């Protein structure tokens, strides 16, 4: 039996703030389902203040011990919970994890150094030393680095996944020993460009390196995408692979989704039309069944391609369309969408908020989903929109390239519309193509059906990870 420990700083449904939480909430369960009796998959994460009492009531205290982090001697409690066949461990320390948010504290470096040290220190007390420790992003990078520098368990292999190379865990060398409890000799391991870089350290130290889509694995070898780490990535390319994320197709299922007004299927789509009318009413837009809704559900930040949207928004709105925006982010984009909604009240609904229930209704009601990202390691929104029959229009980058294939009228293959060059008018041309397809009802029905039948399950990804673990 292969023993796997999945180390993460967040996981749904316990505590999450982004894509890593979705992955950590779904992949371990799928690994267990795919591996059956041949794998023992367990997950460890911090016990944040935001973990609900409902889950706390299901936990049992597994063990308590003291973690030595340089001169600090810190309490650690390990709580255990079993859910969907997977054992979850929660690292308890209120000083580090009883905060208002998961990240963004001045001492995040110390918090996650403690977490990483606690993970390795707990293995003997809980009686579970894994064959493979699978760490994720800079917050658990020190698990891999500590293991390499201290050789905790010689037989244990380490897999490290980069979910977004922009976040690297950079700190001053002044805290190498005082906070990270690393010897001076570790400077060569974690040092990069004049500072500590935890992501770089894990890349160098791990036995296998993965990222969240095959295309992103190729992209981060280039200077444009690698945020300075292209040399390190290329030096370690022999152990790099890209495995496309999936989505939770039970939660995101238009056939049985209690969070949308009307359920529907690829064969019986009438519920989607009803949802569209209800969404138009809810958002104060004219109820026009034949006017396509173009939706964006996104963080309103530059790398999501919003500068392209701002550049040609007026051109887009000259067509018979309605534009629905949901998200928060940089004030320049929030204000732009508020302004354009004021000027085009019958065409634009700008919802500057985070609302997962409204997001579901938008996915289930819209016709076209726009995702013109400058970079996108994997992306989940394009998969969710396709699942709900909202045809994605995406730029060919990262996971968007791997998951959305352009519709070909000659073969009737393809589940969306794509464009390659990061250019506002190339994006606009893709939108015009989508609108032309939309006006041809038999063609649009085929594209929508292809999108809804796309395989975005975690099962495929889980098998690739299991093969990776076996080959270490």
Where are these regions (language model features)?
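Catalytic cores of nucleotide-sugar-dependent glycosyltransferases that transfer UDP/GDP/TDP-activated
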Residues: 1-472
């Amino acid at each position: 039996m292969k023993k796997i420990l999945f180390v993460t700083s967040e996981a749904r449904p316990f505590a999450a703030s982004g894509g890593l939480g979705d992955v950590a909430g779904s992949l371990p369960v799928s690994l267990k389902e795919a591996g059956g009796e041949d794998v023992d998959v367990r997950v460890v994460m911090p016990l944040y203040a935001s973990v609900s009492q409902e889950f706390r009531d299901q936990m049992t205290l597994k063990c308590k011990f003291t973690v030595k982090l340089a001169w600090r001697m810190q309490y650690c409690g390990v709580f255990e919970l079993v859910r969907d066949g997977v054992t979850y461990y929660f690292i308890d320390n209120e000083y580090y994890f009883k905060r208002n948010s998961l990240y963004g504290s001045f001492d995040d470096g110390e918090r996650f150094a403690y977490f990483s040290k606690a993970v390795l220190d707990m293995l003997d007390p809980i009686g579970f030393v894994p064959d493979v420790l699978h760490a994720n992003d800079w917050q658990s990078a020190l698990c891999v680095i500590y293991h390499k520098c201290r050789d905790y368990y010689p037989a244990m292999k380490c897999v490290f996944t980069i979910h977004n190379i922009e976040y690297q865990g950079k700190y001053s060398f002044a805290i190498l020993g005082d906070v990270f409890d690393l010897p001076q000799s570790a400077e060569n391991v974690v040092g990069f460009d004049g500072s500590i870089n935890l992501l770089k350290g894990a890349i160098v130290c791990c036995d296998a390196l993965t990222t969240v889509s095959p295309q992103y694995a190729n992209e981060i070898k280039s200077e444009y995408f690698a945020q300075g780490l292209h040399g390190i990535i290329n030096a370690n390319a022999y152990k790099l692979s890209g495995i496309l994320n999936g989505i939770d197709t039970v939660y995101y299922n238009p056939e049985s989704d209690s969070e949308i007004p009307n359920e529907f299927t690829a064969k019986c789509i009438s519920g989607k039309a009803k949802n569209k009318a209800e969404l138009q009413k809810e958002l104060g837009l004219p109820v026009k069944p034949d006017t396509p809704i173009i939706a964006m559900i996104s963080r309103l930040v530059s790398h999501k391609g919003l500068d392209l949207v701002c550049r040609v928004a007026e051109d887009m709105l000259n067509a018979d369309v309605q534009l629905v925006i949901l998200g928060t982010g940089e004030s320049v984009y929030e204000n732009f969408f508020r302004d354009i909604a004021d000027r085009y009240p019958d065409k634009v609904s700008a919802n500057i908020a985070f609302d997962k229930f409204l997001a579901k209704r938008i996915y289930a009601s819209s016709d076209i989903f726009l995702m013109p990202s400058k970079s996108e390691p994997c992306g989940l929104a394009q998969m969710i929109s396709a699942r709900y029959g909202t045809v994605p229009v995406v730029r060919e980058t990262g996971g968007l390239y791997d998951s959305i294939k352009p519709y070909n009228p000659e073969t009737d293959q393809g589940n969306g519309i794509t464009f390659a060059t990061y250019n506002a008018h190339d994006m606009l041309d893709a939108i015009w193509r989508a609108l032309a397809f939309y006006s041809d009802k038999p063609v649009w029905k085929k594209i929508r059906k292809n999108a809804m039948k796309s395989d975005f399950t975690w099962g495929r990804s889980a098998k690739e990870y299991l093969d990776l673990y076996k080959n270490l």
